[in-house]
Each structure stands twice: as C-alpha cells, then as structure tokens.
Amino acid sequence: MSECLMFGMDCEARCMTSMTADEENICFLVGTNNIKNDKNQVNKLFMDPEASRLMSKTFRHPAGEVRAIAAHPTKSTILATCTADFSSLGGTHSITIWNIEEDKRTLETVSRLPTEQVMSCLEWEPNSMKCAAMTPFRPEIQLLNMENGPEIVQNLKIPLENEEDEMFSATWSPHHDGNMLGVTGGRTAWCIDCRTDNEYLKIRDAHIHRTISMDFNPNLQHVIATCGDDGYVRIWDTRSTSSALTSLHPHAHWVWSVRFHPVHDQLLLTGGSDASVVLSCAQSVSSEQQIEFRDDEEEEEDDDLVEKLQDGQLERIDEHEDSVYACAWSSADPWTFASLSYDGRMIVSNVSRKHKYALMQL
C-alpha cells in the first residue's frame, strides 16, 4: 500500500464527493453533520503543489447538518446539499444549491427547495442539470431540475417489498444518457428507466439483510456491483440475475459504499463499518479479463514471465478509527481515491505502483 495523507475535521461527517468539474486538481468536498447547527461546514480538501499534504478550505454551512452533498459536473464553484436543521421542533429540511465564495470563505445561497422529510441521497447526473434525491422513509426518487431550481420535475415510485424497508442509495448509469437510475432499498437493487417510470431490472435479495449501495461498471453496461450489511460485494450481469457473477467478502461488517474504478473496471473500492477501506480485484468478470502484465525486470530473473492480476483483495487501509461511510475516486487522477469516516477523518490514498503497473501492463 502506498503512503496515505490524512486530514481531521472538527465535526462528524458521512458525505463526500469528488469535484468532477476540476480535472486538473485532486479535490474533494466533505459535508459535516453535527447536531449543533453553527458548527456545520463544507470542507474543500485538496493537495498542496508537491502532493505531500492535504490542504483545506472551510465554508460555514448555515442551513444545519449536511446529509448529502453533490458537486456540479461542470462548474467548480457550484454545489448542492441536503440539509437538516433541528434547532426548532420537528426540524426543517431542504435541498439547497450554493455558490462557493472562495475569497469570502462563505457559501452563498443560489436557490432552495424545502422538503417534508430529511433527504439522505443527492446524485447529480454528470451530463445534464438533473439531480436525483431520496429520503430513507419514502419509496420514491425525486428527479430535480437544478437549472431553474431545485425544482421537482418527476417522482419515480419504487416498489419496495415491505413497507418498513428503508431506501438507501441512488446512482446514475453512465450508459443511458441520464435515463437509467440504480436504486437500493431493503434487500433489493433496481434499475429504473426514468423515461417510463418502469422497473427495468430488479434483483431481489441481492444481499441477506440490506442492500446498501450499488454502482455501474463504466465499461460494461450490463454489469453492476452491489454491497450490503453482510460484508459482501456482489457483481451482477443484468441480463441474468438468478445468481451473481462473483462475490467478494472484503469487510467484516456493513459495506456502505462500492465504486468501480473509472477506467479499469476490475478495480473496486469499498468502505465499511469495520473502519476499513479495501481495494479489490474482480479481474475474472471485468472488461479486461485477459489483461496480463510483466513484473519489474529488476525483481524478476525471467523477464518473460507473465502473470495475471488475481481476484480478491489487493490493498487494505486500516487508518480509520470509525465507520467509513463514503469513498470516491479522484476526477483529476484516476489512481487517487479518498475515504471518509464518521469521526471526520479523511484519508487520501493512491493505488500502489505494483498494481498500477500491472493494470497498465508495464
């Protein structure tokens, strides 16, 4: 494992996103959720020019707790948050678009949409001004027009198996022009066609207890990954879902987040309640399943020896001391990833040189 960079925030935090609009600098946004409203903030974390330490710019979040955060796909000064303010009886909740005032170190409200319940998920579609938002307590996804709003333009109904089941996550497919949404709730994973509000795919009992998160393979449109509180990550072929293509068991407790590498889809990044971040390989079911690589000539007596990257755990980071709720790949450097634990600890790591060279066949 390569050396990690660490940064500690003043408050608890469980939501993080990469700044997709900044393709030159490694940069992430983190929102805190402290019960004391005046302490909550949005942190912009980035590398110093020598990439030797993490730097932070802090912006007070005046709307209370940050329950979800999304970065604008093309404008680095715009972000959106799902907010929760419990300073009054019953609390107030909203989805708010902010403009980052770098010089003033403030967040300027662009527009705000009050919501009846606290929203726990907010996903900006990469190629449009559309967002998906959800609450854990209602079986539906709200599609929002972020250009004139946030403004609700569509409600997608999710057919939960049991009324008491919670909704967990929503993820946009990169293959369907912003028309396909991956959703998890209860023990089930769905792919929903936003044009018809119809269920395109349903994987019942994807995990034993709860199916918490999912992601789409960036290179194979028929392959998805799910994770759950059974500690497993499962990879599925959406054309035949009677059984998973493969199952990995990288965590000893709940897995909160799973993310495919943006280029090399055999790499999977996960974070879990066992305070660990794991980089796994699923070479056998990837688009690059025939990849082979040469070991460094200085380390191998026979430079013609060719090996394959094997399925299973590649790297494990145990530098967190609390549940890891979020992990993300950098938009500027595909070999860099970040993880966030509930105690506010942010760790930025790199794929080790050994595995990087293996994937690049160097």
Swiss-Prot record:
InterPro entries: EIPR1, WD40/YVTN_repeat-like_dom_sf, WD40_repeat_CS, WD40_repeat_dom_sf, WD40_rpt
Localization per record: Cytoplasm
Family affiliation: Belongs to the WD repeat EIPR1 family.
Role played: Plays a role in the trafficking of cargo to dense-core vesicles, probably through association with the endosome-associated recycling protein (EARP) complex. Important for neuronal function.
Keywords: Cytoplasm, Repeat, WD repeat
Protein name: EARP-interacting protein 1
One of the record's GO cellular component terms: cytoplasm
Tagged with keyword Chloroplast: no
Domain of life per record: Eukaryota
Null allele phenotype: Defective egg-laying and slow, but coordinated locomotion when stimulated. Reduced levels of both unprocessed and processed luminal and transmembrane cargo in the motor neuron axons of the dorsal nerve cord. Double knockout with either rab-2, rund-1 or vps-50 results in reduced levels of both unprocessed and processed luminal and transmembrane cargo in the motor neuron axons of the dorsal nerve cord.
Major location category of this protein: cytoplasm
Gene3D superfamilies: YVTN repeat-like/Quinoprotein amine dehydrogenase
Keyword Repeat: yes
Spans of repeat WD: 61-108, 206-246, 250-290, 319-359
GO terms under biological process: positive regulation of dense core granule transport; positive regulation of egg-laying behavior; positive regulation of locomotion involved in locomotory behavior; protein ubiquitination
Tissue specificity field: Expressed in the hypodermis and the pharynx.
